């Protein structure tokens, strides 16, 4: 439990690399950047996940639990869908790592449209829709620009963590860097946040 959000709180932020939408079953990189607050990169972990698979949750849990970074305090996710519709079970990440999870998104997701796409394209759509719905309440942090969900941490503390770990953009620095690194691995150069 986090009582006070310190300026140099240790966080790990995950994002995936870019991919072609018609490449279901292929692999894409998942990058986790470990930081002290918003300034010091402490380390990086990587895993490969399946486009439109169901392995991102296991990859995140393994990356955290098998790493040498034992002083992590919070997991930051850039959304809950990775590699297409490879959806994170945020409750399971919280339970199996013992770390609170904060999901950060810049655009408010259209859950109805996502559920419709899942029903249309996936035989296991019920499992995926359940994961979407179990991610927690979406809260607006910066009106029209930044939203978040929190599991295992109060929404007030989660907002503090987001603010303390952000530096060069609205999103936490660990997520910004994870995005840049993952897209550079997949495309040869980083993509705009």
Curated annotation (Swiss-Prot):
Name of the protein this chain belongs to:
UPF0215 protein PH0071
Q: Which family does it belong to?
A: Belongs to the UPF0215 family.
Q: Which Pfam families match?
A: DUF99
Q: Which NCBIfam families match?
A: PRK00766.1
Note the InterPro entries from the entry. Endo_dU
Taxonomy, top ranks, is: Archaea, Methanobacteriati, Methanobacteriota, Thermococci, Thermococcales
